[in-house]
Amino acid sequence: MTDQERLAAYDRMYADLLKERDKVLSDMDRLRAAGKNRGVTYQQLLALKLTVQNLIGRFEIYGIKEN
């Protein structure tokens, strides 16, 4: 794998993390609006949100930030 390919892979991974974060937040909002914010699905989404935000934060430590 060349440096260009590696950089492109990191860019794709960062973009995918941002998309996943947005989807998780949307799903959480939908469940919250339905009054299901104490259910197992909501709790699983909350854990996933924290994991994804942690990964995004690690990118930001190295200077890769959302536009």
Give a label for each model feature:
Residues M1-N67:
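Extended, charge-rich alpha-helical interface modules
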